[in-house]
Amino acid sequence: MQFLQNIPPYLFFTGKGGVGKTSISCATAIRLAEQGKRVLLVSTDPASNVGQVFSQTIGITIQAIASVPGLSALEIDPQAAAQQYRARIVDPIKGVLPDDVVSSINEQLSGACTTEIAAFDEFTGLLTDASLLTRFDHIIFDTAPTGHTIRLLQLPGAWSSFIDSNPEGASCLGPMAGLEKQREQYAYAVEALSDPKRTRLVLVARLQKSTLQEVARTHLELAAIGLKNQYLVINGVLPKTEAANDTLAAAIWEREQEALANLPADLAGLPTDTLFLQPVNMVGVSALSRLLSTQPVASPSSDEYLQQRPDIPSLSALVDDIARNEHGLIMLMGKGGVGKTTMAAAIAVRLADMGFDVHLTTSDPAAHLSMTLNGSLNNLQVSRIDPHEETERYRQHVLETKGKELDEAGKRLLEEDLRSPCTEEIAVFQAFSRVIREAGKRFVVMDTAPTGHTLLLLDATGAYHREIAKKMGEKGHFTTPMMLLQDPERTKVLLVTLPETTPVLEAANLQADLERAGIHPWGWIINNSLSIADTRSPLLRMRAQQELPQIESVKRQHASRVALVPVLASEPTGIDKLKQLAG
């Protein structure tokens, strides 16, 4: 494995949720400890539960791992860190500023950027503690800061003075006010990250087109700010032996090999390792030790793993329920790569096929959806908005209005603030909201939705409500986009996830965030499930068994309505395949 050769003191793993960062970081830590190195493993992944992996309690203080001599671990809870961080900023102003101002500030500090910055605050303590490198040869982190966070930390000028003069404009600069450590410490931490003698960054991906494109963007973004010592690990690759006697396994293998042969050009030059798909979840030292093997695990015979099929309705049953209202807004929500665009297209095609008037609006960057579907069904209209164009338009508007009075340092801060994920969400939602009102007469299906945090920022603790109420007078009837989304009679939010631990946890967090904004998801779609796919591959059957607890947890803990969609042998593009998916 190339990424394991001549490892510097700090090793960071980065990649989207569910690609295997924590498993690979744990396996790496074990491998190094077995070589006689003293290793500290730092986990900030809320889904990881490193303690469960090693069968012992791990907390916010360094604990020796009993089962692996030489290995210690530490868990940083990013949500708890963010909560303490918020309290540091908000508690001193409670009772001093009006309640609505405090509430607005609290909301600015409730997004992903705050969690990210609070976690980096904790990282900084570890990266700048010289005594740790006398106790440990390697410190391994199972997540890495984003380029956006590092750029914010690199920017000159006082964050707090910028925030004081722009209280209503800062979505990601608000959190900077709570940074406790000295600027020199952050500068040292960023310098340590950029030094190839001290830090190696491992990008973790699966062989899926969207995941690889996302990793390529991360690679470029981090390289541009000096983090150039990067390696690529492709995890969960199906062994060729599984493809021999099974149609589905053969199709998956071919799809993955094609993705491997056509890696994004930006990734082609990186030292790359591949890890095989494992039959069981990575819990316990023996399972983790096998993960870094260059040989696939021998599978049992397929008869040993007869499939237990979960009793959960198909997507068509969910669409039949949706159709009863005869019109309405259908919004699909979920993390990147879970299949929102495909699910939205399948729902729209099925509704149109049932005779309803449907407008499918997509932010699919590939634009293949609009090309495949447009004009194919008489009562299906397809429109596409370009997230990059909309974001750029929104950024220019903010820079021309709020940026007008700022000095150069202030403008640079505002420009970086406008690179936050919240900005794209707001811009895309504003573009989508142009068609939302059509949902009173027909079905409007959207393949993306803003988070609860973004909606609350947009709604600014009801300021939008009050402004419209003032204009309409007491007797006027009015509806803001927020009110429309909060009305279950008119809007159905569907969460899309995968039957794996991290994607389910991420979807549950999205649901909790929407509920803070008074929006209750109507149902969940669990996509890409092996548990209801037809396969004789022993490895895929074993993986199907691993899905069952996750599917059960969605059904019991998170959703009143669930649909299960199988892994498909070929990509569902075109009317006929989409009809099959939701038919």
From Swiss-Prot:
<dbReference type="InterPro" id="IPR003593">
    <property type="entry name" value="AAA+_ATPase"/>
</dbReference>
<dbReference type="GO" id="GO:0016887">
    <property type="term" value="F:ATP hydrolysis activity"/>
</dbReference>
<dbReference type="InterPro" id="IPR016300">
    <property type="entry name" value="ATPase_ArsA/GET3"/>
</dbReference>
<comment type="function">
    <text>Anion-transporting ATPase. Catalyzes the extrusion of the oxyanions arsenite, antimonite and arsenate. Maintenance of a low intracellular concentration of oxyanion produces resistance to the toxic agents.</text>
</comment>
<keyword id="KW-0614">Plasmid</keyword>
<keyword id="KW-0059">Arsenical resistance</keyword>
<dbReference type="GO" id="GO:0005524">
    <property type="term" value="F:ATP binding"/>
</dbReference>
<dbReference type="InterPro" id="IPR027417">
    <property type="entry name" value="P-loop_NTPase"/>
</dbReference>
<dbReference type="Pfam" id="PF02374">
    <property type="entry name" value="ArsA_ATPase"/>
</dbReference>
<dbReference type="InterPro" id="IPR025723">
    <property type="entry name" value="Anion-transp_ATPase-like_dom"/>
</dbReference>
<protein>
    <recommendedName>
        <fullName>Arsenical pump-driving ATPase</fullName>
        <ecNumber>7.3.2.7</ecNumber>
    </recommendedName>
</protein>
<keyword id="KW-1278">Translocase</keyword>
<dbReference type="GO" id="GO:0015446">
    <property type="term" value="F:ATPase-coupled arsenite transmembrane transporter activity"/>
</dbReference>
<keyword id="KW-0067">ATP-binding</keyword>
<comment type="similarity">
    <text>Belongs to the arsA ATPase family.</text>
</comment>
<feature type="binding site">
    <location>
        <begin position="334"/>
        <end position="341"/>
    </location>
    <ligand>
        <name>ATP</name>
    </ligand>
</feature>
<feature type="binding site">
    <location>
        <begin position="15"/>
        <end position="22"/>
    </location>
    <ligand>
        <name>ATP</name>
    </ligand>
</feature>
<dbReference type="InterPro" id="IPR027541">
    <property type="entry name" value="Ars_ATPase"/>
</dbReference>
<keyword id="KW-0547">Nucleotide-binding</keyword>
